[in-house]
Regions:
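A diffuse structural propensity rather than consistent per-protein peaks
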Residues: 2, 75-81, 141-145
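Short boundary motifs at domain starts and secondary-structure transition points
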Residues: 25-31, 151-154, 287
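Secretory targeting signatures
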Residues: 1-30, 91, 178
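Active-site-proximal C-terminal subdomain of hydrolase catalytic domains
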Residues: 159-287
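Cysteine protease catalytic core and zymogen-processing segment of caspase-like enzymes
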Residues: 100-186
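Short, glycine-/Ser/Thr-/acidic-enriched flexible segments
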Residues: 15, 43-44, 168
Length: 287
């Protein structure tokens, strides 16, 4: 084999080693970025404020711990959106919800008259979608149930799900669906809630999580909607000692470490390349 081919082989070997180490260094839950999302359609109830203050205050709390925040509002809250939330670490569902039969369903902002375009989810013995109505306005919307989340949602990666709507944790079916898809904890209400009550309690929850660094069980303690008597609770029980702030720290540290690794690679490669070039010149001079 000629010396030129040997040198070329060495370069290829270096590239392979760098690529292999790069893959090894990627975080195991690399599909998740330190991002949060607020899915927001409480304003479907006309007397309910869109509560710009809630979104601004929640975003500020999350930004201060290094998280980017996306906000999907009213008409952006579709059936398909519920399928595509797996990339978020913190998922705040500021949406209407309620019981259909024995299960909690989450409202979309799509009028029930549009149900035809989701025919693939309809049929006998299919409980993927429901007809959910707001009693004060009489308007009805498409809602997604636990089986929809379980069968069609993206996988989550230890995500924290905060369901702000009514009866979101009256039974555990919806929570179980999110956990089955990879969420670490589901937080929701045991009864009906008011917009003001859920906004205030959720902001307090976020402060306890990301400013006071409390565990799930301590963060939800005594958080109630005084107007209805609803309590904020969590599922599963084994998540009681989870600290959501720690999840963010792990992702940020992993992302920073990986960035430093990538930055250093050109230096390592250039040094190796320089040494090989010297070897090539020495070999060349022998002829």
């Amino acid at each position: 084999m000629s010396r030129k081919l040997i040198i070329l082989a060495l370069f290829i070997l270096i590239v392979i080693i760098v690529a292999a180490v790069t893959v090894f260094m990627l975080p195991q839950n690399g599909s998740v970025q330190p991002k949060a999302v607020i899915v927001d359609n409480l304003a479907l109830m006309r007397e309910a404020s869109s509560n710009k203050d809630f979104v601004e205050n929640a975003t500020k709390i999350l930004n201060e711990v290094g998280m980017e925040v996306d906000h999907f509002y009213l008409e952006e809250v579709t059936v398909n959106l519920y399928k595509n939330l797996g990339s978020y670490l913190i998922v705040i569902l500021r949406v209407h919800s309620g019981m259909l039969g024995d299960d909690t369903y989450l409202f979309t902002s799509e009028n029930i008259q549009k149900i035809g375009k989701y025919s693939q989810y309809l049929g006998k013995n299919k409980n993927y979608l429901g007809n959910a109505c707001i009693s004060t306005t009489g308007e009805c919307f498409i809602a997604v149930g636990p089986s929809f989340i379980r069968d069609f949602s993206e996988n989550f990666h230890d995500s924290v799900i905060i369901a702000m709507g009514c009866e979101s944790l009256k039974t555990t079916a919806l929570a179980e669906a999110f956990i089955a898809k990879g969420a670490s904890v589901f937080i929701g209400w045991t009864r009906e809630v008011t917009p003001e009550g859920t906004d205030n309690a959720t902001l307090q929850l976020l402060r306890r999580f990301f400013i006071e660094n409390k565990t799930v069980s301590k963060a939800v303690k005594d958080l109630v909607d005084k107007s209805t008597g609803a309590k904020l609770d969590f599922y599963p029980d084994k998540a009681e000692n989870l600290k959501p702030f720690s999840l963010i720290e792990k992702l940020i540290v992993a992302k920073a470490s990986f960035s430093i690794f990538l930055i250093n690679q050109p230096l390592i490669f250039n040094e190796s390349q320089f040494e090989i070039n010297l070897s090539y010149r020495r070999l060349f001079r022998k002829f």
